[in-house]
Amino acid sequence: RVCMGKSQHHSFPCISDRLCSNECVKEDGGWTAGYCHLRYCRCQKAC
């Protein structure tokens, strides 16, 4: 499943936490994304 995530400045594709970089961590109740910042994957929490 793929959703659209948002950072403070732009949107980016969101992917399953299983596909996210191992340097990222899953946000509680949320999707992880291919864009990582401060070891967290930033994404909206709903599709």
Swiss-Prot record:
Q: List the disulfide bonds.
A: 3-47, 14-36, 20-41, 24-43
Coiled coil (residue ranges): none
Question: Any idea which UniProt keywords this protein has?
Answer: Antimicrobial, Disulfide bond, Fungicide, Plant defense
The protein's superkingdom reads Eukaryota
Q: Which InterPro entries match?
A: Defensin_plant, Scorpion_toxin-like, Scorpion_toxin-like_sf
Key word Disulfide bond present: yes
Which residues are listed as membrane-spanning? none
Which GO biological-process labels does this protein carry? defense response; defense response to fungus; killing of cells of another organism
SMART domains per the UniProt record, alphabetical:
Knot1 (SM00505)
Q: Which Pfam families match?
A: Gamma-thionin (PF00304)
Spell out the family assignment given in the record's similarity comment. Belongs to the DEFL family.
Q: What's the protein here called?
A: Defensin-like protein 2
The source organism is Zea mays (Maize)
